[in-house]
Amino acid sequence: MGRIIFYEDKNFQGRRYECDSDCSDFHAFLNRCNSIRVESGAWVIYERPNFMGYQYVLTRGEYPDYQRWMGLNDRLCSCKMIHFVSGSEYKIQLYDKGDFTGQVYESTEDCPSVVDRFRTREVHSCKVLDGIWIFYEHPNYRGRQYLLEKGEYRKPVDWGAVCPTVQSFKRLME
């Protein structure tokens, strides 16, 4: 069971909204979100209702302002709890072309720089064979984030991206 608390103001001040399950639109309860406390579980939060727009992955901890979760502004509207599978291994295959074609790169560990490790700047498709992964738009786990659970992603839009730029990625662990 997870629990996340959203606050309108920085440093856990102002009105708050608590969630212990997925919520497709909490904007009616909060006009803005400037701080978050994750009491348990891992969550993906979205800037728009119905789990759309920029996404941010948060684990247990305190985020006193939106820069701490790499947010671009104080707008958040929906959230989903991430469900881990016990004893999960981690394995991902990245492809430099869509539909699982072209050069394939495989990893079982975090990668702070896709360019340094694989000599490519773009991921056009991927298969998450085990575990939960986060793609980042920039090296060293910065920029836009994309949560990828076990499954196949034939093109960047399948994981929520508009372009194939993936500069780093890491495993999401409990």
Curated annotation (Swiss-Prot):
Family matches, as Gene3D superfamilies: Crystallins (2.60.20.10)
SUPFAM superfamilies, per database record: gamma-Crystallin-like
Alphabetical UniProt keywords: Eye lens protein, Repeat
A Pfam family that the UniProt record links to this protein: Crystall
Alphabetized SMART domains for the sequence: XTALbg
GO molecular function terms listed in the Swiss-Prot or TrEMBL record: structural constituent of eye lens
InterPro entries: Beta/Gamma-Crystallin, Beta/gamma_crystallin, G_crystallin-like
Boundaries of every Beta/gamma crystallin 'Greek key' domain copy: 2-40, 41-83, 90-130, 131-173
Region described as Connecting peptide: 84-89
A single GO BP: visual perception
PANTHER family: BETA/GAMMA CRYSTALLIN, GAMMA-CRYSTALLIN S
Record family assignment: Belongs to the beta/gamma-crystallin family.
Functional summary from the UniProt entry: Crystallins are the dominant structural components of the vertebrate eye lens.
Notes concerning its domains: Has a two-domain beta-structure, folded into four very similar Greek key motifs.
Protein name: Gamma-crystallin S
Gene: crygs
